Amino acid sequence: MEFSVKSGSPEKQRSACIVVGVFEPRRLSPIAEQLDKISDGYISALLRRGELEGKVGQTLLLHHVPNVLSERILLIGCGKERELDERQYKQVVQKTINTLNDTGSMEAVCFLTELHVKGRNTYWKVRQAVETAKETLYTFDQLKSNKVEARRPLRKMVFNVPTRRELTSGERAIQHGLAIAAGIKAAKDLGNMPPNICNAGYLASQARQLADNYAGAVTTRVIGEQQMKELGMNAYLAVGQGSQNESLMSVIEYKGNPNPDARPIVLVGKGLTFDAGGISLKPGEGMDEMKYDMCGAASVYGVMRMAAELRLPLNIVGVLAGCENMPGGRAYRPGDILTTMSGQTVEVLNTDAEGRLVLCDVLTYVERFEPELVVDVATLTGACVIALGHHLTGLMANHNPLASELLNAAEQAGDRAWRLPLGEEFQEQLDSNFADMANIGGRPGGAITAACFLARFTRKYNWAHLDIAGTAWRSGKAKGATGRPVAMLSQFLLNRAGLNGEE
């Protein structure tokens, strides 16, 4: 799908369709008023007859409006004018895209980007429209024998901006939006891939392909079990013992900083390509969704793709911690004591608390990069889902400025997060009679104690932890990976690169 921006009046648009907003109660937006004037009151007469109230998401498709050059006009309800916020704006764009795609409008000029959204500029409105459009049209049908396609799908969207001086901002927004959307799609595709295809080896192949696609900027190294053993990554190795698939850690390095020796930002993604729970076997119901336990790694992959596509002036390392947690004769057991790469020992009380065992060794491994900061992303705890539901990613950090940066990026991107505490008072829940710590801390504050466990391996750098257990995928009829938090982390990196779109 193609996107572009232009600045022009609606009466001069010769297009398959013009998209304009209508507010409650039956109030035309300024652009709709211009079209109404051209058509001698045709549109306002329809509204007076009750054809459209203006509630968020309502649509009315008009054909051959008098004196209008375009074939059709799509009126889209935007709710109350003063209440149009980020969430409603994205809902309106989503409804617009679906309607255009379903009604055979192969190209359209969209004036929704001229609407006033509280606290948001043209760059934000155009970028969010691009990202939302790509999200709306996303399908995962690679493994279906019969693919359903729209007869006349939407192919081209032109976003109108109020003035010519905003064209540059709009073009930059499209560039950024397309790169972020591609990163989100890559993460969703990996997440949706079945575990008989997407194992640690598949993740490694995708990481290598990324290096091939962006040769000169991206390099990939894959570390196998033998090298992990030599490094002392015994906790990581233990988790994969029950699987016939080898555990593989894919290290993707992107160097975009003019100073190649600049300290990198490190992103670590939990990549449990299937989590049966090991000996502490999960219930059978819903176990199929444990293919999504690698969505942390998938999101890191998507962010690395975005950074390479935009050639961000940063040095970034992305680690995909690929592994599979299965029961079997070689599987690790409750009661085992593991010596981690850091030298600290862990008593395994539950083999289904495996993500932290993989991550703790990776968080020790990345010390060698002397990172400016480290962010890990993991579908880590059901407790985070109970605390924050499926709307907010859990954020914990040992560095307040880093936490603030991430929360700000989350709000900018519309990929929201909520900070949870990381207090020392929670650490005692991890006490063990037989090792330095246990791998679980009981039910109270489970998301926090999981992060407290990881914090014991991150004392040498500024670190944040994103628990995406509630936000990485949807269940039910809309089942599928969400691609979160690619948008948040992409915004974080754009901000770091000074490319945040502020005017």
UniProtKB/Swiss-Prot annotation:
Positions contributing to Mn(2+) 1 binding: 275, 352, 354
Record-given protein name: Probable cytosol aminopeptidase
Disulfide bridge positions per record: none
Subcellular location: Cytoplasm
Cofactor descriptive note: Binds 2 manganese ions per subunit.
Entries under PANTHER family matching the protein: CYTOSOL AMINOPEPTIDASE, LEUCINE AMINOPEPTIDASE-RELATED
Catalytic activity as recorded in UniProt: Release of an N-terminal amino acid, Xaa-|-Yaa-, in which Xaa is preferably Leu, but may be other amino acids including Pro although not Arg or Lys, and Yaa may be Pro. Amino acid amides and methyl esters are also readily hydrolyzed, but rates on arylamides are exceedingly low; Release of an N-terminal amino acid, preferentially leucine, but not glutamic or aspartic acids
Molecular function per GO: manganese ion binding; metalloaminopeptidase activity
EC number: 3.4.11.1, 3.4.11.10
Entry keywords, A to Z: Aminopeptidase, Cytoplasm, Hydrolase, Manganese, Metal-binding, Protease
